[in-house]
Amino acid sequence: MVDILRLVWYHQLEVRAMLINSVVQREAVRNEQMILQYESLIGELPKGSITCRKNGYYYLRYREDGKLYDRYIGKGAEKVDAIREKLALRKHYVEMLSALKREQKTIHRLLEELA
């Protein structure tokens, strides 16, 4: 009788381990998909910062291939505000992406331990 109970107990542990493993694998796939989505969203948004020069002329300052570029935005507050919103959105996406990458490392460590 004790052997049967022990066998059932071990079987329950195996089932739990398999369930945990499948949940973690699904989370890894979801995490990878979200990383790809955030990377594509970040690629569409402008990078850099807004600078104001003499007489209220605004420029978008960014680096590309190690070189510093200034792209003229204009004097209009609407254009400047729109680009500021896009820059803030990009910053948010970059923060989310770094959190997802940290989470991905944890998931891979967990999968290695479960294997």
Feature annotation, model-predicted:
Residues 1-115:
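A positively charged, amphipathic N-terminal helix/segment that binds anionic biomolecules
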